[in-house]
Amino acid sequence: MVAQIIDGKKIAQQIKSEVAHLVQMRIKAGDAAPCLAVVLVGHDSASQMYVTSKRKTCESIGFISLAYDLPNNVSETELLMLIDQLNTNHSVDGILIQLPLPVGIDNIRVLEQIAPHKDVDGFHPYNLGRLCQRAPLLRPCTPRGVITLLERYNINIVGLNAVVVGASNIVGRPMGMELLLAGCTVTITHRFTRNLQQHVQNADLLVVAVGKAGFIPGSWIKSGAIVIDIGINCLDNGKVVGDVNFSEAIERAAYITPVPGGVGPMTVATLIQNTLQACKYRKLS
């Protein structure tokens, strides 16, 4: 068995085209284009790269993109004041704070300062709570992107045993909630989990997000499983790989996401979907 590749680049491009069309329809109807404010603190090269990609994507589909590049020594108070200004700016639909923030700034406090209806990353406790209550509004981008990939490939996951390896607030935990909402029986594993191999071997659907290259051997993959690799790791030779040993896993899985080109593009695609949704909320309110 050789797994079918789940092409995140292709699906992300489809979504961008769909959103661009909806934006043009809004503009023709006399409505404003969606507006996303992206806040970058400091000069982390990886963060700068991600922010540049997000801004270019927004502009390419007709969004208004506002850039707020703050110095590394900005205070938490100053950052919170900027967020308050963006919260009350009626022309701004979405606010994105690029993580990680510098040492000395409380990530949780900053994310909680964003108005829930402008929280296009889906990290605010209100939005996470809505997801837990089976009434999601703005959803965390990477987990929602995974669900979209499965839907676009017509992969039925209802009733499957889903195992999430990694329990981060950004990916693992909301991923578990998304899979539960989709009808899976969900196990979330973490650093204290015993018998990780046994959990992985029982997974009909395996989602891995730990940030460790090749952490899951292909021999652990259940024959015919669906493998979603969210990890992005850069090796010393410059090669980018995931958390799953791809060359081994592809021989056992039924479906698998590559790294790069799998889940990564879907995170940005979901961000623009969320921003358009936030724009619609603003109009309704």
UniProtKB/Swiss-Prot annotation:
Q: Gene encoding it? A: folD
According to UniProt, the name of this protein is Bifunctional protein FolD
**Cystine bridges: which residues?**
none
* Gene Ontology annotations for the cellular component aspect, listed alphabetically: cytosol
- Record GO biological process: L-histidine biosynthetic process; methionine biosynthetic process; purine nucleotide biosynthetic process; tetrahydrofolate interconversion
CDD domains referenced in this protein's UniProt entry, alphabetically: NAD_bind_m-THF_DH_Cyclohyd
Q: Which terms are listed as keywords in the entry? A: Amino-acid biosynthesis, Histidine biosynthesis, Hydrolase, Methionine biosynthesis, Multifunctional enzyme, NADP, One-carbon metabolism, Oxidoreductase, Purine biosynthesis
The family annotation for this protein states:
Belongs to the tetrahydrofolate dehydrogenase/cyclohydrolase family.
Origin organism is Baumannia cicadellinicola subsp. Homalodisca coagulata
Ranges in a coiled coil: none
| Binding locations of NADP(+) | 166-168, 232
Kindly name one Pfam family recorded for this protein: THF_DHG_CYH
Which GO MF terms does the UniProt record name? Answer: methenyltetrahydrofolate cyclohydrolase activity; methylenetetrahydrofolate dehydrogenase (NADP+) activity
Task performed by this protein: Catalyzes the oxidation of 5,10-methylenetetrahydrofolate to 5,10-methenyltetrahydrofolate and then the hydrolysis of 5,10-methenyltetrahydrofolate to 10-formyltetrahydrofolate.
Key word Hydrolase present = yes
Provide the catalytic activity annotation: (6R)-5,10-methylene-5,6,7,8-tetrahydrofolate + NADP(+) = (6R)-5,10-methenyltetrahydrofolate + NADPH; (6R)-5,10-methenyltetrahydrofolate + H2O = (6R)-10-formyltetrahydrofolate + H(+)
Per the record, the pathway is:
One-carbon metabolism; tetrahydrofolate interconversion
